[in-house]
Amino acid sequence: LPDITLVSPVFTGDAGEQGSGGAGVTASPDIASFPSAPLSPHPPAFLAASRAHHADVGGMSPGSMPLSTELYQEGIIIPPLKLVDGGRRNDAVWELILRNVRTPWERDGDLAAQLAAHATGAARLAEIAGRYGLDETLRQARALLAYAESLTRAAIARIPDGIYRFEDALDDDGQGDSRRPDVPVPIRVAVDVRGEALTVDFAGTAPAVAGNLNAVPAIVESAVVYCLRCVALALLGELPMNQGVFAPLTVRIPRGSVLDPRPPHAVAAGNVETAQRVVDVVFGALAAALPDLIPAASQGTMNNLTFGGNRGQVPGSREDGMTHDPVSSPLAPDPWLLAPSFAYYETIGGGAGAGPAGDGASGVHVHMSNTRNTPVEALEYSYPIRVEAYALRHGSGGRGRHTGGDGLLRAIRFLSPATATITTERRRRGPYGLAGGEAGAPGRNALLRGSEVVPLPGKATLALEPGDIIWLETPGGGGWGEPG
């Protein structure tokens, strides 16, 4: 939380919190909290920080991944403030957050877990400093930074010098209207390799869009570093992750572009969708420099599905509609906290791109997703839904000497009224192939209502009735090499 000092000093044991795509973190659901560790009072030598994605922080649709057009629609905006003050939890701030979300008992527990993580991190740092002394601890920390920098420079030096360009696009501006013209949103990159230094320039990228696909610079830089680390791990076998990795790297992003919008542009999907396309263009550019290393494009989307509503009288639920006991909070036993609402957010895997070494993996999360499969049993136990189908989408991987991985089919039936939002990409153009390989199959979305099959665009918000089925087919990965 770089600007926490604009609010008040951070004292030992105090935690500041921030969650807002326009104020330093990636999107409103990604709440960051930064306490100081008790190692050195003025200023703190280390901070034990955490950032967690919360499944709902309010906003215009359950799951806080709406088809938004401005930041204010995406959930509560938390400026830098004290969540823990003088060693005590600030219950006024805590209550303000809980009253602005659909599932306050979940947020209560998740926020408490973040604070517990801080306490553990601070204790471990204090233990190290107590054992070795603060000066030696700082010396070793600086050595780790220098080691990561030297490895990063060594990896860059193994990439042939040159300027490598690539372009790909998002399907649309994120508004989700299938009647709108097919106007892709281009993302362009030039990767300039010079000795041990790397410059990644996104000049020529599209301006900020009306929808929520705008990404903040922190997202773009993280995606670039992810690509660089993948290359370094492949070339060198190791690369620790710390600020030293950034030292030989320069990232240039046009202000006002879809990769650096001005507030209050919407940014909810920048983290989950636009980041995937940033990875695709950076890898696409590096493929010209490292053709025997870089794979074809993976599915290029997280296939975000959020839904929520009120449980009501759902078979298997308790009389009050609750399936879980709320934890202790400043609101208990406030009826607001006990409201029988639910909100859920998941991402769905797809096909990985094939590469020079072999076929792509099928039915996996790729690149920036950072999530895992949700088990069907846990999902059906926790929410008023039934998973009707969950299978590989055979034949969706792009053909080539090596075939791209297959996407997935996931169909979910709703047992009670709900509001759902799908935020998906690669529905109009499939993931690219490389070295003559074919593109993977684009994804498809549909609503099944009775005997009717309603095709859906890549982005949509739906008012669902009991019995409705959301049907998602995720993209396959691109193929690599000329098909045999």
Where are these regions (language model features)?
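Glycine/proline-enriched, intrinsically flexible loops and inter-domain linkers
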Residues: 1-14, 44-199, 203-312, 334-484
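Intrinsic disorder/low-complexity segments
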Residues: 14-43, 175-179, 310-339
